[in-house]
């Protein structure tokens, strides 16, 4: 049976020495939201718990201000 090589996950925010995640930085936030609009969990992205909490808050703020969609367009 062949074993698959699993890439080591790392926290992008720690590597870039980010102090605070901004809700106006939509390109960063979109990378952590799935196609259906759900926030991607840290066990998949490798984000540390501190930044995952900041990320969730920033995504929720951006959604509230209509900068990000709550869900996908449902393909109508």
UniProtKB/Swiss-Prot annotation:
Keywords from the UniProt entry: Ribonucleoprotein, Ribosomal protein, RNA-binding, rRNA-binding
Coiled coil regions in record: none
GO biological process annotation, one example: translation
Cited SUPFAM superfamilies: Ribosomal protein S18 (SSF46911)
InterPro entries recorded: Ribosomal_bS18, Ribosomal_bS18_CS, Ribosomal_bS18_sf
Example of a GO cellular component annotation carried by this entry: cytosolic small ribosomal subunit
Molecular function per GO: small ribosomal subunit rRNA binding; structural constituent of ribosome
Keyword rRNA-binding in record: yes
Short name of one Pfam family: Ribosomal_S18
Domain of life: Bacteria
NCBIfam families (UniProt xref): S18
Its biological purpose: Binds as a heterodimer with protein bS6 to the central domain of the 16S rRNA, where it helps stabilize the platform of the 30S subunit.
PANTHER family: 30S RIBOSOMAL PROTEIN S18, SMALL RIBOSOMAL SUBUNIT PROTEIN BS18M
Protein family per UniProt: Belongs to the bacterial ribosomal protein bS18 family.
Subunit description: Part of the 30S ribosomal subunit. Forms a tight heterodimer with protein bS6.
Protein name: Small ribosomal subunit protein bS18
Organism from which the protein derives: Pseudomonas syringae pv. tomato (strain ATCC BAA-871 / DC3000)
